Swiss-Prot record:
Organism: Arabidopsis thaliana (Mouse-ear cress)
Matches recorded under PROSITE patterns: PEROXIDASE_1, PEROXIDASE_4
Protein name: Peroxidase 51
Encoding gene per record: PER51
CDD domains linked to this entry: secretory_peroxidase
S-S pairs: C36-C119, C69-C74, C125-C325, C204-C236
Enzyme kind, highest EC tier: oxidoreductase
Active site: H67 (proton acceptor)
Length: 329
């Protein structure tokens, strides 16, 4: 057995830190300038076309990006389909609720990029997902921002790698902060990225515990607004089909804005992991700040999304460019 002294341990941590930062340092905005200069417009056009078909494209793509980056980094490994010999990430129970429109957005954008002769097999699925995510945020009324590019697609995808990597709707602030810290993201990044819940929906089963069986003292979570409880119970009665979905933001579910934080101030966070951002004194001042200033929230969200896009990236020979986003080459 090798005993590691403090010096060697510090050197190991430093080497890992440098390796992570060297990978993300290879990302740049003009990565495809010489190979596929119009790639961002091609992707945006494909995303716009997809949104015209269904609004679900927007929250589905945004959620897909988070689930990809938090498991093995932003490498499109969540796109891989399972085979007889490998159960992939997308088939882990925590990913089964990912809407198919998110996957289809990346597939359609990839087809559009590869239809341009000089772009064919030059742009990674990981970068296409990154660009598409930026575009759905902007097309829903959110900020426009520049993305860093140059990711390679991951070479592995397994359901077992997902366990413990994604936040649960029951998480408290300590659990949220710890999970985000594992990905190099700060408490402020966590609060900003939680703001993505201004869009999209969740299944009723994810909130049953807050409505009907919260704890030994209260059947209903006392932090939920009483009028909101009535609304939620009407939408999610106990005998309802578990596949029925409800909006994350009860007020402006199709608009990317700071109303998510205003909702938290009124006790209208859908998940425990949402409402705790307001009930915990450590995060409450940030919620109040962004509830009162949408521009500050947008700036924080952009910064945190760029940081998220650097998590666990593969560059150079650490990955490849998939011909089919759903299968390894």
């Amino acid at each position: 057995m090798v005993v590691m002294n403090k010096t060697n341990l510090l050197l190991l941590i430093l080497s890992l830190f440098l390796a992570i930062n060297l990978s993300s340092a290879q990302l740049r905005g003009d990565f495809y300038a010489g190979t596929c200069p119009n790639v961002e417009q091609i992707v945006r056009n494909a995303v716009q076309k997809k949104i015209q078909q269904t609004f679900t494209t927007i929250p589905a793509t945004l959620r897909l990006y988070f689930h990809d980056c938090f498991v093995n980094g932003c490498d499109a490994s969540v796109m891989i389909a399972s085979t007889n010999t490998n159960k992939a990430e997308k088939d882990h129970e925590d990913n089964l609720s990912l809407a198919g429109d998110g996957f289809d957005t990346v597939i359609k954008a990839k087809e559009a990029v590869d239809a341009v002769p000089n772009c064919r097999n030059k742009v990674s699925c990981a970068d296409i997902l990154t660009m598409a995510t930026r575009d759905v945020v902007n097309l829903a009324g959110g900020p426009q921002y520049a993305v860093e590019l140059g990711r390679r697609d991951g070479l592995s995808s397994s359901a077992s790698s997902v366990t413990g990597k994604l936040p649960k709707p029951t998480f408290d602030l300590n659990q949220l902060n710890a999970l985000f810290a594992e990905n190099g993201l700060s408490p402020n990044d966590m609060i900003a990225l939680s703001g993505a819940h201004t869009l999209g929906f969740a299944h009723c089963t994810k909130v049953f515990n807050r409505l009907y069986n919260f704890n030994k003292t209260n059947n209903v979570d006392p932090t939920i607004n009483k009028d909101y409880v009535t609304e939620l119970k009407a939408s999610c009665p106990q005998n309802i089909d578990p596949r029925v979905a409800i909006n994350m933001d009860p007020n402006t579910p199709r608009q990317f804005d700071n109303v998510y934080y205003k909702n938290l101030q009124q006790g209208k966070g859908l998940f425990t992991s949402d409402q705790v951002l307001f009930t915990d004194s450590r995060s409450k001042p940030t919620v109040d700040l962004w509830a009162n200033n949408g521009q500050l929230f947008n700036q924080a969200f952009i910064s945190s999304m760029i940081k998220l896009g650097r998590v666990g990236v593969k560059t150079g020979s650490n990955g490849n460019i998939r011909r089919d986003c759903g299968a390894f080459n």
